[in-house]
Amino acid sequence: VLGWIIGEVLGIDPLGIKVVTGDTDLTPVDLGSYSSRVTLMTGNAAMQAAERARELLAKGVGEKLGIPAGRLVFADSRVFDAEEPKLGMTFQEAVVCTEARFGTIGTVGSYTPPTSPAKFRGGGVGPSPSYSYSATVVEVEVDPLTGIYRVPKIWMAHDIGRALNAAVAMGQIEGGVYMGLGEAMMEEQVYRDRTHKGNRIFVHRIPSMLEYKQPTGLEMPEIVTYVVEDPDKNGPFGAKEVGQGPLLPIMPAVANAIFDAVGVRVDENPVSFEKVFAALQSKADGKEARFGPSNGPDGVPKVDFGDSLKIKTPWQGGDGTAWNEPKREKKAAK
């Protein structure tokens, strides 16, 4: 994706661009590529660096050909006059003449997310100017006697902003479906609870990757993919992430589809056949038709999170302040 962004700015074939792994010898310390931030954040930085290189090249070519730099077009691996397209040179020639005029061409780009306008406690955590959205429909077939089920078909729609490479984007979306299906159906690490020298420790019940199941071609369903393009002004050429987003709705969709089919809830991942069978047995015995952690002392503890904060949007006249945030006492410095 970074190569495609740079290629689009400079008007050259992305296959001729080499993207190397950066390190702190060449670049400043970066927070990382987690949370599907490469296309948006690194993409914006790459675009800025490419635009600076294009500006320098335009100046060099403009002086060489006697053409105003603002009239030059970068396309089809050439740099040419917008008014007289035949007047120009190849991109390689543009690099040579610019280096002869200004020396080695080296430009940098950076990107910092905009500061969050939120003034309430925790409002500045993990700011991002844009987010992707996904929606999915999962079809399941469940055996009401055994709890064994299969997923024959999944429909997945993902708002990508703009697809910089449609084929790769669809592959990413379907890869997210694959990952989500693995988490929903079978991926699990089972531990033994042991005490050693007074310390409570956990060890794998079956320490083998053979027992960490993932979907194969036999388990993968038919996937109908919808790439929803709504360009985002904050992304490079309007693009947003297409990495982790598509996997998120798969797990709740599988659980909801099973409930719709046989009327039982499984409230923990993976939604294995054994858990569905246990929930079916509980339902048949007249008990709660569910399987999952209880709300008792050994289950999920109840946590009082308090009232939700209420923040008016800018168009409602808000300034980022939560009008119902509890006041915090200031402690005197010692």
Where are the regions that the model predicts?
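Flexible, small-/acidic-enriched active-site or ligand-binding loops
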Residues: 1
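C-terminal catalytic domains of large/alpha subunits in multi-subunit enzymes
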Residues: 4-334
